[in-house]
């Protein structure tokens, strides 16, 4: 860490844990209001503006918090947003910058992925405990798979055409798989021992990296042999995660305390950490600019610059909005070959409706 530059009793365990997290999140936001003003003021003295706000897409009639994004990179480009508090999936045309469709009655949707070659949308429903599969053209329901447990984060392996499904609690918690072509649930699954939050699939190997906040661990699962190793972590509520496979690094966001942490992918050793935006739920690694974007419900995006794989620097705290912890950063270039965009979903608040903010990264000079 020296190398980094500063800057209800009878409810199911998963529900109790979620309730505690939501209470903690609210308290964190309240306690962070003063810190937000300070962070925004101090960011003005940083070298340059790391992100430029280019658009705000309104979402009238959408209420409550958001969970996750997915993207369709084909022209004109679509954004899929799980509006958890609104029980809906909001679909945005990125060229027109407007909502084009809403799928309703999803029962607190959480994870969402889009299978581009198959034109299918997969949506995880927490309350219905199901994985819904929709046709991506007509938005028609194809089928639903019942997991009999909290269905949360999803990941899509485009090469294998498989959707990875994080579901369940305690001993029943696992990451299962669905054949995206046949829409069939596969028998194989990976037991995690507790409900997982963000997990990432390595592209250069069989590993899957999994945040397990209830156990204060990061699990590394070999998808071929099913062997599992576990890294203990010092802080609490490790939720978002991103990978830098070229430099063998795992980036993790913690909520208690608010920290951006870097782990060696081979050893599991934490090589450093820095304070970041509170109440984070998404973070992304920009391999071209060597940056990490950490979105926090505190109301800003912490931007970190990699100096080398062991050294990072906070270069900006970019204002967004209270509750803006849901973000998306598609790897593909923006529309018509333009720059990529960082999208942040902001819930509705007094005097202002829900919206999606779009930022363009600004390279350092």
Task: Label the model's feature ranges.
Residues 23-35:
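Bacterial N-terminal signal peptides
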Residues 6, 30, 39-43:
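Intrinsically disordered, low-complexity segments
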């Amino acid at each position: 860490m020296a190398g980094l530059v500063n800057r209800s009793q009878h409810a199911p365990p998963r529900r109790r844990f979620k309730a505690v997290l939501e209470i903690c999140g609210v308290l964190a936001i309240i306690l962070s209001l003063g810190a937000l003003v300070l962070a925004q003021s101090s960011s003005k003295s940083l070298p340059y503006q790391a992100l430029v706000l280019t658009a705000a897409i309104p979402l009238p009639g959408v209420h409550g918090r958001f969970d996750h994004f997915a993207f369709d990179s084909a022209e004109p480009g679509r954004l899929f947003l799980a509006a958890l508090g609104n029980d809906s999936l909001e679909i945005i045309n990125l060229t027109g910058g407007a909502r084009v469709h809403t799928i309703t009655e999803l029962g607190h949707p959480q994870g969402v992925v889009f299978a581009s070659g198959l034109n299918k949308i997969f949506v995880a429903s927490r309350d219905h405990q199901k994985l819904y599969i929709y046709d991506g053209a007509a938005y028609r329901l194809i089928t639903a798979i019942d997991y009999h447990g909290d269905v949360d984060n999803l990941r899509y392996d485009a090469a294998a055409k498989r959707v990875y499904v994080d579901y369940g609690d305690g001993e029943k918690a696992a990451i299962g798989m669905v054949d995206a072509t046949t829409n069939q649930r596969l028998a194989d699954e990976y037991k995690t021992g507790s409900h997982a939050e963000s997990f990432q699939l390595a592209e250069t190997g069989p590993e899957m990296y999994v945040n397990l906040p209830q156990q204060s661990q990061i699990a590394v699962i070999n998808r071929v042999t099913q062997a599992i190793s576990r890294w203990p972590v010092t802080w609490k509520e490790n939720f978002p995660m991103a990978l830098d496979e070229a430099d063998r690094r795992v980036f993790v966001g913690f909520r208690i305390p608010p920290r951006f942490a870097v782990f060696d992918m081979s050893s599991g050793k934490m090589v450093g950490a820095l304070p970041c935006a509170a109440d984070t739920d998404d973070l992304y690694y920009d391999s071209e600019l060597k940056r990490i974007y950490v979105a926090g419900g505190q109301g800003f995006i912490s931007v970190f610059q990699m100096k080398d794989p062991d050294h990072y620097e906070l270069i900006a705290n970019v204002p967004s909005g209270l509750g803006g912890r849901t973000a998306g950063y598609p790897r593909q270039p923006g529309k018509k070959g333009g720059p990529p965009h960082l999208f942040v979903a902001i819930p509705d608040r007094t005097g202002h409706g829900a919206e999606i903010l779009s930022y363009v990264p600004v390279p350092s000079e």
